[in-house]
Amino acid sequence: MDKQLLPVLLLLLGVSGSWGQGEEPGGPSEVLPEEPTGEEVPKEDGILVLNHRTLSLALQEHSALMVEFYAPWCGHCKELAPEYSKAAALLAAESAVVTLAKVDGPAEPELTKEFEVVGYPTLKFFQNGNRTNPEEYAGPKTAEGIAEWLRRRVGPSATHLEDEEGVQALMAKWDMVVIGFFQDLQGKDMATFLALAKDALDMTFGFTDQPQLFEKFGLTKDTVVLFKKFDEGRADFPVDKETGLDLGDLSRFLVIHSMHLVTEFNSQTSPKIFAAKILNHLLLFVNQTLAQHRELLTDFREAAPPFRGQVLFVMVDVAADNSHVLNYFGLKAEEAPTLRLINVETTKKYAPTGVIAITAASVAAFCQAVLHGEIKHYLLSQEIPPDWDQGPVKTLVSKNFEQVAFDETKNVFVKFYAPWCSHCKEMAPAWEALAEKYKDREDIVIAELDATANELEAFSVLGYPTLKFFPAGPDRKVIDYKSTRDLETFSKFLDSGGHLPKEEPKEPAASAPEAQANSTLGPKEEL
């Protein structure tokens, strides 16, 4: 499915590497032949190959067993395969008590039903032979990510620190270390801390109950401290005595404070940018090849601390491969240096009023003005083509959309498309034929709008193609068209004033609108 660069994930959407949804399975799979009980379980690239009989044996033999349910035809499974094998090799080299295995899902329907496998690949982790409550893997699709996730389940997820030497050694080894200072290591707060440590794979965790370490770091109560070798150097999260340690609050705190005050946007940082779940992103567009542009980063960073957790400061290098970001904001590289702010929830974009010098004061003032509602958001629009109304299909842009779509004397049928969308290209002949058929009707307008280059105040377009009908009249009524995209059905829809008979078949899923890229989940092929 083609996907558009979405506002919410505008900065190249951080596909974070957890498992999401994708293609529907249905390809053939060869059923494994019967194997005699007791026969040695085969291996492929360090991975046990299991079926409904040998899975039971493997669970008895291996106290920690991860099983990948895959399909031979599944593209995502094929992409995962080398990483999965590398993870097995990493753990074997460490003599870890974890075994990795796989099951051909289509060949083993009883197992996929038992373990509620709804897509491929699905990874389940079994401990101590318990087949009733396996834990599903939702971490990165990388060898190190899989291996580290397993390490933190078969071994400690955090290091017990008993003296200053241990703390300093841990801090020296890593750029970021999270240390929980707890007076009671058997309490609920400690359990919450360890639960978080199991899944926060990009951080290293330690804990202590030693009074001298509380004193050393100026603490008088239970506190989780993030030590880092950049920016402020340290961030404290005191434990609330009344409510205790909240897993969600601590997780958000660590994500926010593990971010640099200014994050350069690239494919490596984009997952973390969106994982921070900070709704406002302030972007500084600069050309990193120019010294005078690089110097602006000092002031940009100086403005950031008061907005930590509220506004994420991001630098976009216009000299790098970031044309998609520039296009999204309607900018050209030569307009740098410049600022833009986007709310990734509403997708509203803001620009400074007039040309401003980029200083710490002006950056802070711009942020405050947007947050206080003193600056109106802007909409992207192409210029109105001189011949926009000359052909059977009328060309709309943001600047003429309201005037045409809500003309009280016209019934207007609009296709919102993306130039790269395959479904849009497939339906183009039918749309042209529809316009040709009704070109002599004064009361009907067939139009199209490139929704990647034109934004509308009235609504957002979330998939392509999106078809909307604007019937004549003063009510500004909008009817979504969700049926078959062919000339016959389009004509019935128009002739009935925007209605279709109830028995009219709906558009099959294979031709559903192509979604914009607004998911942070990685792919999984559905059953």
UniProtKB/Swiss-Prot annotation:
Catalysis performed (reactions): Catalyzes the rearrangement of -S-S- bonds in proteins
Enzyme kind, highest EC tier: isomerase
Gene3D superfamilies cross-referenced by the UniProt entry: Glutaredoxin
EC number: 5.3.4.1
Cysteine-cysteine disulfides: 74-77, 421-424
Signal peptide (UniProt feature, chain positions): 1-20
Positions of the Thioredoxin domain: 29-155, 355-499
Coiled-coil annotated spans: none
Site (Lowers pKa of C-terminal Cys of second active site) location in chain: 485
Glycan attachment sites: 130, 287, 518
Family to which the UniProt record says this protein belongs: Belongs to the protein disulfide isomerase family.
One record GO biological process: platelet aggregation
Record organism: Mus musculus
Assembly behavior: Part of a large chaperone multiprotein complex comprising DNAJB11, HSP90B1, HSPA5, HYOU, PDIA2, PDIA4, PDIA6, PPIB, SDF2L1, UGGT1 and very small amounts of ERP29, but not, or at very low levels, CALR nor CANX.
Tissue: Highly expressed in pancreas.
Protein name: Protein disulfide-isomerase A2
Stretches the record annotates as Disordered: 20-41, 495-527
